[in-house]
Amino acid sequence: MSILVVDVGTSGLRAAVVRQDGSVHFLNYESCRPDTPSSGLVEFDPQKMADAVLRVCNATITQSKNSDTIDAVGITNQRASTVMWSKSTGKPLGPALGWQDLRTVFDCITAASEHSIKLAPNQTATKAAWMIQNYVVAKNLDFSDVRIGTVDSWIASVLSNNKLHVTDSTNAGATGLCTLDASSWSERICDLLKVDVSMLPKIVKSTGVIGNATALPGSPPIASLIGDQQSSLIGQGCINSGATKITFGTGGMLDVFTGTTSPTKMQRSENGSYPLVAYSDEQTTFWAAEAIMLSAGTNIEWLRDDLQIISTSQESHEIAMQVNDSGGVVFVPALFGLGTPHWDYGARGTLLGLTRGTTRAHIVRAVLEGIAHRGADMLEAVIADTKLSVTSLRVDGGMSQNLMFMQSLANTTGLNIEISPVTEATTLGTAFLAGIAVGTWPSINQATSTTKPAKVVTPTEKLDRAQWHEAVTRSRGWIPSLSSLDF
């Protein structure tokens, strides 16, 4: 019994087979990077994404046909990116807006000042409103023929030959358009933004059969939709209160499972984390809290592509290990500002403590340690907001393979670091939820029991957090106009 997983990320997408023992096979990947037509704008071509999804799915199915029977399909995706397409033809009505797109910043400010609605530009709400005005109203299109959805909705439509128009509660909760429990659309918010509720998808549970992938051989049932970070949370077995993971990709996302008690508001908490739906089944909605690092792996790319002091991302480990410490150098990884707990969009990357004796090894090590310090910042913020006890930290993403970085994370947090056996744990999470729906596993506990840490890194020393906090203070407010923004 096997599950086909479709994982659509920000820079690429993949398909793979997950077997009953939790092992991942026949992975096929295609790069699918967004376009940036000008500063602050992030778009992608939905049709190119759809074509790529079908290619990787068909490749994986072909490779697995002699060894695996596909029992179900699970879909996991970048959250909040917004697609608009025709109900009658299933074709896109214009470029999709990526979650990083900032063209609606002033719409968010207006929503807060005039209507007391707190929205962020990385949510779907104002993107959908912008698309309606620019793709529908401006072209005098028929409102009844318009569908709007996040990437999970779009891929479900593609795989079902335009039969399904659905999203799950984890994705709905990231739109800014739904009710507090993420079970239905808020008519008040939709009315204020002039988003017609009839254009939006039906909100379904994260696990459960919702239709068939008739665009694929055998038409397997689609049995799970879930946002990528929540999928990673489940994929690393974080299904008990206080269980915590960090995914280090382009940015860094820390999520802690908080249980079944719903939050009193779906807004940023006092220490900069956000409540969100972890996943939902027929009986229960489970909750989590999330902290965000705006820049993680991008700092390594900066060392490699711009400063050119490392040749490959993997070399950052080798170079950093040439010295015992950073030689007093501190790097604040704020290339795009600071997320949790500060939320200072005007902060900028800061390199302090340079001397004539500073080498590239010191700088590379300082960059890795700076990202680790940001991980500790996020952890402290989430603990303060949730009042939960966190006893270990599970980690996935490309940077989880850098053992020097993993050691720095252990030393800054004081926790054991449990490294995921699968770099992209998102693949496992949605597989588990789809498998539960069709009987591959009898329960979430049984499913997650199949995955164990590939390695556990324990703290060996305590890195200086006082000097770190001083460095962060110096990095903040560099661009005052951006620092004043509050979403």
In which residue ranges do the predicted regions lie?
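Short beta-strand-loop/turn "lid" adjacent to the catalytic site in phosphate-handling enzymes
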Residues: T62-G98, A120-N122, A156-T179, V204, ...
